[in-house]
Regions:
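Conserved redox-active cysteine motifs that mediate thiol-disulfide chemistry
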Residues: 63-80
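Thiol-based oxidoreductase modules, predominantly thioredoxin-like and allied folds used
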Residues: 89-101, 115-122
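N-terminal "domain-start" segment that seeds a small globular fold
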Residues: 23-51
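Bacterial N-terminal signal peptides
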Residues: 7-19
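Alpha/beta-hydrolase fold active-site loops
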Residues: 58-59, 90, 135, 145
Length: 175
């Protein structure tokens, strides 16, 4: 009987580990409902910060690269969203996956982006966020728990998307 329970436990344990690994998009990815791990963010248009700096308020993280056409297309709408809510209801940050800092900073300057952007040259955040495709936008609650991940470019400041953001964060946003 002992051998049966031991075999059952090991089989269940291995099945759960293998299924988790098989469906992970990137190594070390934090899935929906998981909590982001602490890491230092390398500032592109401002100071470097620890990820925990943004705790206490919902957070929208957009993963992008200067060479990515869809990323470039949605960046202006993210800027308008960030300016409209000005960190009052939530914060917006960008994570560049560019290989070269100068490419990312040139894009930020060219487009006039003012919300905080960081460089992920060691791919820690790209892996943690599951950014195997970009653009990727992640919604994180005030405690650092991942609520939703959306792949693809969107007009984030549209009335429909503002309403959807409010629903994800369980807050009422004015259009």
């Amino acid at each position: 009987m002992r051998i049966f329970f031991l075999t059952f436990f090991l089989t269940f344990f291995l099945a759960s580990v293998l299924s988790t690994t098989a469906f992970a998009g990137t190594p070390g990815e934090v899935g929906i409902g998981g909590y982001l791990r602490e890491t230092t963010l390398d500032g592109l248009n401002g100071s470097s910060r620890k990820l925990s700096y943004f705790k206490g308020k919902p957070l929208i993280i957009n993963v992008w690269a200067s060479w990515c056409g869809p990323c470039r297309a949605e960046m202006a709408s993210l800027e308008r969203l960030a300016q409209r809510y000005n960190g009052n209801e939530f914060n917006v940050i960008g994570i560049s996956t560019d290989d070269y800092r100068n490419k990312a900073t040139a894009f930020i300057k060219q487009t006039g982006i003012t919300f905080a952007n960081f460089l992920d040259h060691r791919l820690l955040l790209e892996n943690m966020l599951g950014a195997n495709t970009i653009p990727l936008t992640i919604f994180v609650d005030a405690d650092g728990r991942v609520l939703k991940k959306i792949r693809g470019a969107y007009a984030w400041d549209s009335p429909e998307n503002i309403e959807a953001i409010g629903e994800v964060f369980h807050i009422k946003l004015k259009h």
